[in-house]
Regions:
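Active-site-flanking beta-strand signature of metal-NTP-handling nucleotidyl enzymes
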Residues: 80-84, 150
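C-terminal helix-cap and adjacent tail motif
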Residues: 6-13, 17-22, 140, 145-175
Length: 175
């Protein structure tokens, strides 16, 4: 893997062929997730659910459409990976969100290497977080809140090198 090559090609993919992710691809994605750092090494504070059942994906999509008034917020991807964490309720503690984000980015980069499309998902996750029946269907443990997700799947949308503007993020260098 060439990390910079993957970083400069990674993008949000929103079109999918519907071809399922293979068992080998899933295993490699999960290995990338397991390699992610988690605050203070507290891996028991985060859980991951891999959703491939079409009926569950449809239910999540429907919940998101109902809440946000937009159809197909999962873009027809055959896989949704949901990250849920124990939130402490303290606004100053964002480690749960940060942990999910690091896992999602590892998954994103692995998807690039595997030639799979991927897109970081928030709207459907927000809808899922408010639907106790769906959380139960996804076997999200009591006390955990869905905080991030990634759709993954085969796509005809190829990864090509992007020109990333310098200073895209306002930056101050204090030396």
């Amino acid at each position: 893997l060439n990390t910079m090559k993957a970083l400069l090609r990674r993008k949000s993919v929103r079109t999918y062929t519907g071809v399922p992710v293979t068992d080998d691809q899933r295993a490699q994605l999960l290995k990338a997730a397991y390699a992610s750092p988690v605050a203070m090494g507290q891996y028991d504070s985060i859980v991951m659910t891999v959703v491939e059942k079409p009926e569950l994906l449809a239910q999540i999509d429907a919940a998101a459409a109902k809440q946000f008034g937009r159809e197909k917020m999962l873009y027809g991807a055959p896989m949704l990976i949901v990250l849920a964490t124990k939130l402490k309720g303290d606004a100053s503690d964002n480690s749960g969100y940060s942990n999910a984000a690091t896992v999602i980015e590892n998954l994103n980069l692995a998807a690039v290497e595997l030639g799979l499309g991927a897109c970081h998902i928030w709207g459907a996750i927000a809808a899922l977080a408010e639907d106790d029946a769906l959380k139960q269907a996804l076997k999200i443990p009591e006390g955990f809140t869905p905080v991030g997700g990634l759709v993954v799947g085969d796509s005809a949308d190829a990864y090509t090198k992007r020109d990333i503007p310098d200073n895209r993020i306002a930056t101050e260098i204090l030396d």
